[in-house]
Amino acid sequence: MLIDRYHEAVESLLKTVRETQRDNIFKAGELVANAVENGGKIYLGHIVHGIEMDLIYRGGGPIFYKEYKPDETELKEGDVLFVSSVSGRTKAVVDLAWEMVERGVNVVAFTSMEYAV
């Protein structure tokens, strides 16, 4: 049945994420915890319709500080910025990520290198 094939596909994708991204997920969690403990802030990129926006106002989850707005937000060293680009090639996202890394901001990127190839 279609629903069974769907569940199998989802389970396969989740297994791949667990097996290939586990360490990165823990690293991202440590970046967030360290930023919060040291007075830093957590920002969400929102350049495109990114998955990082699912982290704002989610029932049962944390309510993050605010979305990043280039003209209104000054990120500083030790802050964390989440960005996303399905392909990892969205110019505005890549440029923002590099600029923030140069400023000492920790950047967590949601992307799919498999999709980008």
Residues covered by each model-derived region:
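Generic N-terminal amphipathic, Lys/Arg-enriched alpha-helix
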Residues: 1-19
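Short, contiguous, pocket-lining structural segments
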Residues: 2, 24-27, 47
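A short linear-motif detector with a strong N-terminal bias
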Residues: 3, 21-23, 60, 107
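Predominant activation on well-ordered alpha-helical scaffold segments within soluble catalytic domains
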Residues: 11, 29, 33, 53-56
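Short, glycine-rich nucleotide/cofactor-binding loops
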Residues: 14-24, 81-90
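Surface-exposed alpha-helical segments enriched in charged/polar residues
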Residues: 15, 30-34, 98
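A short, well-structured juxtamembrane/interface segment
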Residues: 20-37
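Glycine-rich phosphate-binding loops that contact phosphosugars or nucleotide phosphates
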Residues: 37, 41, 46-117
